[in-house]
UniProtKB/Swiss-Prot annotation:
It catalyses: 5-hydroxyisourate + H2O = 5-hydroxy-2-oxo-4-ureido-2,5-dihydro-1H-imidazole-5-carboxylate + H(+). Pfam families: Transthyretin. Belongs to the transthyretin family. 5-hydroxyisourate hydrolase subfamily. It comes from the Bacteria. This is 5-hydroxyisourate hydrolase.
Amino acid sequence: MSGKVTTHVLDTSCGKPAAGVVVELWRIVEGGESELLTKAVTNQDGRLDKPLLTENKMARGVYELRFQVGDYFLRNGFVNQAYPFLHVIPVRFGLEDVNEHYHVPLLVAPGGYSTYRGS
């Protein structure tokens, strides 16, 4: 199995994929500092066109996905306030085995979200 980190975003308020969500992948380094590894935007299926991280760049450690959902909700008219309740959703996770597929989906609505380790 080739290791990689992937995600997808579903908008549970309308039951559709969330297109146009900016997703950042950060590595948490010594002292708790964050290092931006990559940034991508979800496509019409709410998925990314390629993995955020692949086997040759994977390393054991702590990572954080940051989903820029506030801009998505504003752009699509789901909220009508300058400062949406959910703006950036951070999901911090541990990566132990560089040969595994780490899929971290986000189910989101303007008032809440959930995530899980997918396959």
